[in-house]
Amino acid sequence: MFSQDFFQKLTLPDLDNVTQCIRGLSRSTVISMGAIAAATTYYVAMRPKALPPICDLQMQSVEIPGGEFIHQSVLLNGDNLLTHFYDDARTLYEFFLRGARVSNDGPFLGSRKPKCAYEWMSYKEVMERSENLGSAFLHKQHSKTTDANIGIFSQNRPEWTIIELACYTYSLVSVPLYDTLGAEAINYIIDKASISTIVCDVADKVKMVLECVKDRKHTVKTIVMMATPSDELVGRGELAGIHILSLREMEAIGKANYRRPVPPQPDDMAVICFTSGTTGNPKGALLTHANIVSNCSAFIKLTQVNCPLGPGDVHVSFLPLAHMFERVVQGVMIVQGARIGYFQGDIRLLMDDLSTLKPTVFPVVPRLLNRMYDKIFGQANTPLKRWFLDFAFRKKEAEMSKGIMRRNSIWDRLVFKKVQATVGGRVRLMITGAAPISPDVLTFLRAALGCQFYEGYGQTECTAGCTMTMPGDWTAGHVGAPLPCNNIKLVDVAQMNYLAINGEGEVCVKGPNVFLGYLNDPEKTAEALDAEGWLHTGDIAKWLPNGTLKIVDRKKHIFKLAQGEYIAPEKIENVYVRSDAVAQVFVHGDSLQAYLVAVVVLDPDFLSAWTKRTMKVDGSYDALCSRADVKAAILKDMVRLGKESGLKSFEQVKAIYIHSEMFSVNNGLLTPTLKAKRNELRQYFRSQIDELYAGINKS
């Protein structure tokens, strides 16, 4: 504390009298003045600086005149949508060439063995391997015009990207497969895309393909395994008329039969990405080089000023490469000459991978963020710890509201440093998408992690994203403005009174990132793309006053209750899962019933702490799930959250069933992209739903 003498004698003297003034001060006052001067100098030098917004954050999109209520990014110069960012990078092959050049043949793809450091391949090494592999594909009679589709059935690893780049180098098309689709769907994709060569990472996937084509007519001629296949496996392949060999053998064939690259054109096909959907067979979205380049370029356009990426950046690859979200992020990293480090293949070891890799770019999905959030608050298990965590968060949140995003505040050092260390301690850019995220979770983790943290929205049919939050806008509860590569309009959903004239309706997207259609499926293509080229997403949204978009629900999931009110179930579910004790919710209703009911899965990691805190009740997970008083308390908490979020009375559930097993891909209740399979959930819980309604009708 400064001395009273200092405050009494502190004045603003003329410069001519400064020496005389100082001589008249006591020694303690002079020391105090020196201390405060030093502190002031330090503060001026180190004070946090707000990121300058790249646009007026109160007007992030503009409406195009014409009466169709079409919105466009304010980052565009004129009406032309963004097709590419770099003139020398208009295809994914050119992305790779540019990355190799700007990195000066720097490290590119990295992997690690357990408890070891990452080992890196350079851009030149990857180029050589991809050209050898691509030459082998051509030697096997693949070409741009004949038998162009190459199946990739693997977890994320460097070889995945080498195969993909081999396809791009020789104008071939990659077709990702993933085991969570199930054998029936993989069978369907192989036939639909007429795949003759499939590259698998492990023997189990080779066996799965062999089972898929067993005792039937098929197109598969070659299976390439990333490891060395056993003699027994090779023999099984021969019985099915399939040549099975290792990736190294395939590369050796290409080296011995080298072909010069056959660069693609922007409008050439790059990927056939099969989307799982919640019903029916997978649909193969046809995506060109121009589609993917425009989407990557839009991301670069948004981040180039405040968070430019380059060869010094490192991306951790763990989200499935079979999905376009991860592919677009990797495309951005490649064209900037950055590094990509792959996780070990076990999500339980991800934190160890992050600690070793120390990434600067970290794409995530809401499910992981929810777990991080729950874990942090689960550790604040005393009133004092919770108060201090809330206090530190509010201080960081206040800085964020001014556009300040940093990791060196006193609150970072005291509270959030360990949180930041869990993701490697160097992350400066994060992006989440693929599913809705709670505004509370996003805001807290933005503050805790202290990096530029964006939220995007889109789907495979528009490559990956069509909106993204702007740098400097760290508010939550929306998915940002249209990307510079596409326009967005909302169209009427009259039965729910969502009208475009009111800034509400179904999201429609048009631009160079919108796909060509579904492989050999004109009927489904016509459902998705209208005559003017607008992609109808099936999502309902509304424009906010600042030109950002807020997603409300899925159009096809809307249903009507007996008294005529329309219900958007996902909107309600997204409210209820904010309850600390709730992990998953399935809201059900139909036109024969006047009320909603729900199946609720409680969070095994946090239920016990929640019941202790709110009910003074303890017990095992199964015991707590079976208690009537716990069920009543959970329902009460859900209804409370519903009221706070503005749900109408008919949107609140009247009864719940507590289920103790998580909905998952393995039990058939979630899609591979972790979306609820509503028809399957309805059938699976039919008897419990009927009992809930019977109980309501009795009371």
Model segments located where?
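Conserved pre-ATP/AMP-binding loop-to-beta segment of ANL
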Residues: 104-107, 241-245, 251-274, 281, ...
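Gly/Ser/Thr-rich phosphate-binding loop
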Residues: 44, 48, 52, 242-247, ...
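Conserved AMP-binding/adenylation subdomain of ANL enzymes
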Residues: 293-317, 321-413, 426, 448
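Conserved AMP-binding A3 loop
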Residues: 120-124, 270-297
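Conserved ATP-binding/catalytic segment of the ANL
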Residues: 496-502, 506-561
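Conserved C-terminal "lid"/linker of ANL adenylate-forming enzymes
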Residues: 559, 584-586, 635-699
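Conserved AMP-binding/adenylate-forming core of the ANL superfamily
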Residues: 84, 88, 105, 109-144, ...
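Structural core segment of the AMP-binding/adenylate-forming
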Residues: 2-69, 169-249, 635, 639
